[in-house]
Amino acid sequence: MEVIYNVKKFLLTLTMMFILMTNVTFASDAEYLLNSVELTPMGTGFEPCDIAVQETLSRITDDSMSTYEKIRACYDYLIDTCSYGSNEERHKYLSYVPDDLVGAGRAAGMLEGHVGACDDYSCAFAVLARAIGLNCYTVYGQTSRARGGMTGHIWTVINVNGTEYVFDPQIDDNISKGGPTYYYRFCKTYNEVSGCYVPASYDKYGYFHSF
C-alpha cells in the first residue's frame, strides 16, 4: 500500500509540475502578445456600466501594470468573485436600455451582483477589456461539454492584428471550481482549443462587436 501511495504521490507531483511549466510558457506568450497591442480605450455609453467598470478597474489595476497584467487581473477578478447563476441585478437595467446596450446592462449587473451565466461573464469581461483599450467582443455559438456533445454558449475574443484569441472566464471558473486557475481558455487561438468552440454563422445576441 505504501508503494502505491508513493507512486500516486509521484504522479501527482509530475502532473502539478507539468501544469506549472505549461502556465509559465503560456503566460510568456500571452504577455508578449497583449503588451504589443496599441490601445484604444472605449466605454459603453451606458453610464451605470461605465461607472461600474471604472470602479472595478480602480480596485484591481493601476498605472504601473502592463496591459497583460491588467487583463489577467480582470480575468482573475471575475473567476474569484463571480459565480454561475441568475443575474438578477441586470433586470433593473434591461427593463429600459435599448437593444444596442443590452450587453452593457448585463455587464453592469454582473459587476454589481457577481452572479450570472456565460453571457454575463463575457459581457463583463468585454467591457473591462474594452475600457483598457483592447478590441474585445462577444461571440455566440457552441462549446464542448465535459460529458460530451456541444451546448449553446457565449464567450469573448480579443482581436489582435486580425487573429481572434479566446477568453472565456465562465468556462475557466467552472473548471477551477474554487481551486487554482489554470487558464485553459485565456488568450488561446481557436486552433489551440480545437474542438472546444463552434462560432455561429450569425450573431444571435449582438452584445459587443469589433471596433
Predicted regions and their residues:
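Bacterial N-terminal signal peptides that target proteins for export
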Residues: 2-12
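Active-site nucleophilic cysteine motif
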Residues: 70-74, 114-129
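Low-complexity, Gly/Ser/Thr/Pro-rich intrinsically disordered linker/tail segments
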Residues: 180-211
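Cofactor-/ligand-binding subdomain signature composed of acidic, glycine-rich
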Residues: 36-44
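Bacterial N-terminal signal peptides
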Residues: 13-22
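Hydrophobic/aromatic-rich core segments of domains that either
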Residues: 120-189
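Secondary-structure boundary elements
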Residues: 43-110
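Sec-dependent signal peptide cleavage junction
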Residues: 21-34
